[in-house]
Amino acid sequence: MVLNYIWIAFFVIAFIFALIGLMMGDTTIFQKIVDSTFDSSKNAFEISLGLTGVLALWLGIMKIGEKAGVVNVLARALSPVFTRLFPDIPKNHPVMGSIFMNIASNMLGLDNAATPTGLKAMQQMQELNTKKDTATNPMIMFLVLNTSGLTIIPTTILAFRASYGAAQPTDVFIPILMATLVATLAGIIITSLWQRINILQPVLLATLLGMCAFVGIIIWGFGQMDKDTMNTVTTLASNMILLGIILCFILAGFWKKVNVYDAFIEGAKEGFTTAVKIIPYLVAILVGIGVFRASGAMDNMVIQGISWSVEQCGLNADFVGALPTAIMKPLSGSGARGMMLEAMKNYGPDSFVGRLSCIFQGSTDTTFYILAVYFGSVSIRNTRHAVACGLLADLAGVIAAIAIAYIFFG
């Protein structure tokens, strides 16, 4: 329901700003908006088309893991934690393994593996859903974990900083890790409070503290490396783990006497079906965002409004130059990336704004895109509190990113 109102607002606000632009002499504003609808529709289809091969690959691998029993082993191992965080999911259900695979892939920055395993988890949770058009509590918790974007290896951002000539491309690594950890913890806490989950249970509390300790160790470890070593280690570790997972599933299938090839084909067929199913949802959300951006509402209403408010309060407004990246990130990953690159180009990669833009880019994920793809894959229309919890987690990540940037670079 919330997503419905947001989508309508994109078009209404865009039309109002287009009328204002026309009265100020911009006779091409309506053409820009209409062109954006065609471009966004084409982009949505191309994204879905690009996902088809990746979905087929990873859902095929996951099907091998299911038939070999690997997913069930993961589910049993994670049951003590996940049965408390997802209390509506039966103990030792295979979806626990899929959720773990998705979270692990996100943490390693393996987007190509994260989306297919996430969609598989959604399909498994939908099988438990008694109201097929309404999001369940476990679905919402799972999506908030995705939108908060906990990533421990922001390889792409570091590569962009290096290409723009940053003196120390890796100097944003620790701030990104800290900001994304805050966003993830905030997402878990907010959603748990909404769903009345007791996060003070010893097992959950120990897990959250363990997660903080793990991130702390990662921060310390990478802090001992120079930038070249760090880039080499992150790339090598990511790809070794990815290939190791594939090999593990295949060998497990062979050991259990599963027809590995047939199992892969069976799962890959599901990937094609899923890719087709999400096209309407992607078109809807990307066209809405495209119209909103093309009308100028993003710059004139949001960015300038925040800048004016901050200045009126007498606060330091240095961070405002990086806000386009933060505001665009929940709406569009490619749009936010473009804003980050533009900030580094205009202000410099080693400027406060340039660094903060990179932290924004790495601290959260594309909330509306994730909601559209994941809910669309199982035809969920009533998203309940998913949007609110996801955006609150994003807000926590943005506030943390600003505070951390002032501590490190202010």
Question: Can you say where each PLM-predicted feature lies in the sequence?
Answer:
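Generic hydrophobic alpha-helical membrane-segment signal
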Residues: 2, 90, 97-99, 134-139, ...
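Hydrophobic alpha-helical context, especially transmembrane and signal-peptide helices
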Residues: 5, 32, 44, 60, ...
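Generic signal for short, ordered secondary-structure residues
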Residues: 100, 104, 139, 230-233, ...
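Hydrophobic alpha-helical segments, principally membrane-spanning helices and signal/leader peptides
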Residues: 35-38, 45, 94-96, 131-139, ...
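Signature of multi-pass transmembrane helix bundles
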Residues: 1-53, 159-292, 311-313, 385-410
